[in-house]
Amino acid sequence: MWRVASGLHLRLFEMDTDITGLARMRLGEHAIHTWDVAVALDPSATVAPDAVGLLIDTVGQLATWAGKPDGRERRIRVSVRDPERNFVLTTGEAVGLTESDGEESLPELRLSAEAFIRLVYGRLGRQHTPPVEADGVDLDELRQLFPGL
């Protein structure tokens, strides 16, 4: 059996990560590609809930890396459920996603955590979109910001 040296850091895809981060990236790939196969057979398929529970807390780093800015300045509250989290999505010259305390009044997107993860991975096409609530937000514009990995 081998042992990983503590403090091991890797530079992947212009991001610094450790072994835990690498495992989380692989989990995300596995969960999304499993969904890719499942949805071909069952249009109502979803990403595994246990994977969603782990991935939602690191979706900000992925959004920053995967987002393709269009130059349009936006600040959007993203409220997700199952599990419940609140973020602020910013766009302009870059795409950013940070945790939010929910205090300021912003245009808002409300959807499941599973659907939001698929949006960031570029997998929230119209044919596979569960119910969402968008107040002052154009979901099609957000789809263009996250064209897929």
Each model region followed by its residue ranges:
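C-terminal interaction segments
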Residues: G102-L149
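Acidic/histidine-rich alpha-helical segments that form the ligand environment
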Residues: M1-S6, G21-R26, R72-R85, P107
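Short, contiguous alpha-helical
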Residues: F13-G67, F116
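Electrostatically charged, flexible surface regions
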Residues: T64-S100
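Conserved catalytic-core motifs characterized by acidic clusters
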Residues: A5-E14, V95-T98
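Short alpha-helical "patches" and their helix-cap loops
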Residues: A40-I56, R75, H128-E141
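Short, structured loop/turn "capping" segments at alpha-beta junctions
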Residues: W2-L8, S44-V47, P69
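Short intrinsically disordered, low-complexity coil segments enriched in acidic
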Residues: M1-S6, L10, L139-Q144
